[in-house]
């Protein structure tokens, strides 16, 4: 992975990790909690990183996401694929910045 996705990684590992329920029960609630605590510039960087990730083919995207999340989050139990999860993050955050 030659591009840094540190802001997205932090969002995923901290807000969607094992203690996700501290921040909400749905993806949208958790993202709203993220926006309440995070600098808007950092949230905008997450949107930009998600945009770059979404340009990847599905195999590379999945491999890169696994590296970013460090095994602490999988979107499938949330009814999402990696791609739909990142699209949801980008859409939700962008609409609120």
What are these regions (language model features)?
Residues 1-32, 90:
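Short terminal alpha-helical segments
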Residues 3, 22, 41, 45, ...:
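Alpha-helix boundary/N-cap detector
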Residues 66-97:
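Amphipathic alpha-helical binding modules
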């Amino acid at each position: 992975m030659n591009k840094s996705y540190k802001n997205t990684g932090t969002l995923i590992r901290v807000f969607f990790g094992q203690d996700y329920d501290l921040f909400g029960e749905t993806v949208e609630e958790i993202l709203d909690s993220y926006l309440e605590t995070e600098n808007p510039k950092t949230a905008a960087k997450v949107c930009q990183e998600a945009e770059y990730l979404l340009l990847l083919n599905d195999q590379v995207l999945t491999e890169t996401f696994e590296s970013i999340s460090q095994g602490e989050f999988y979107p499938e139990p949330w009814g999402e694929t990696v791609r739909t999860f990142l699209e949801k993050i980008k859409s939700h955050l962008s609409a609120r910045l």
